């Protein structure tokens, strides 16, 4: 070891060793620091040890180190450790353990990590089809992201919540979520949110067109609604539904309405 290395703080030495690929040497230094209950660098060293051990293939050792860091309650490194645990459990498909680790992130309460934890919990709830819990967590990710400097995570949460709502026939609620997100989303997230908002409006339009037809409007209005509905549905990948709408109009018992629909159907022929 050179004289300059002897003067380097142990944490920096361990980092340099890890960057050079000497994971065993890095782990030895970090392990000593993490084992000192009174050491000022214990939390940071334990997180570093978790990363190094995971890179070495020692998953259980990495988790033990992460739990050591978490137990310190350090606002930065305990939160990092809980994230490390959660992401590892997710990779293995251990969703209950992952949920517990993400909740530990919330327990630490460090603002920079809270939106990420809410978003992860929302995704877990979505996969488990716990939709009320998912919505609650998505909204929490939006709120904490927007007000905690993590606007990108908040925008991602809004996009995923809106998609979930549209999947469950709630385009109006989805549109409200997206409009809220556009108030704080980073510039490069805005185009995607606007596309989603347009899709939500298409779904709303389809519902209004259908309601107009079912509401017994006059022949001209009903024919217009049928045409608009039939031409809009394919934009949402619903070509078969569009065909059924055309058939409904073309075969309608009201001859005046059917004639109006025929004119509109053959407009582009």
Language model: regions and residue ranges:
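Alpha-helical segment of the N-proximal tetratricopeptide repeat
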Residues: 6-36, 48-55, 84-91
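TPR-repeat structural position
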Residues: 23-24, 59, 95, 131, ...
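Amphipathic alpha-helical segments of tetratricopeptide repeats
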Residues: 31-35, 67-71, 103-107, 139-146, ...
